[in-house]
Amino acid sequence: LIDVIRIPVPTSGNETQSKEALLNAIQTNSCAAFIFEPLVQGAAGMVMYTPEMLDELISICKTNDVFTIADEVMTGFGKTGKTFACDYLTQQPDMMCLSKALTGGTIPMAITTFTQQIFDGFYDDDTKKALFHGHTFTANPTGCAAALASLKWLQSTAMQSNIQRIHQKHLSFQNKIQTHPKVKTTRVLGVIFALEIQTENQESYYGTMRNKLYNFFIENGIILRPVGNIVYI
């Protein structure tokens, strides 16, 4: 299998370490691509970092001829306040992976997008250059119809207003809750709100707090999926 090199998430105070790790990985290895979740590391606990920092990382890759792949499966289609998290960037990725909210979560469907440069690399009469990749459900008519309906709704004035309304609600709640003694950190981006709970034994992502939180919400008629000691909406 191909080796995967991981770098630190470029959160506040960690920027230099992250850039140096990426540059070192490129200079000491034959790197095919830099794969990242833009602005929000979802399953890691909704860890957020700035567009400016990601721009710098992508710039390093472009300078060194390393392809960049944005995993927007979670962040895409309005989650961050814009259609894509990459819309906050100056530097754009070479590829994007999209799914989940593409169909409003109703039918499984995914899209991989490429720059024209990459597309042209496979567009040739010579079959040796073709990208022989496909699957049984390519261009599923029902999935495509659901995706078109979802995109139309996303672009509507009502949906865009709701995104802004939710974002402002999150900011207001953040101001109220962030000084609570049981709250360690809070963060907001678009319609994403994350709250990290302070625990006595400093449990985090892999602690037991997740089960306690999940059961508490279920008992109160609320369906949420805490990530460790982090509650997100």
Where are these regions (language model features)?
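Conserved N-terminal phosphate-binding loop of PLP-dependent enzymes in the Aspartate aminotransferase
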Residues: 1-232
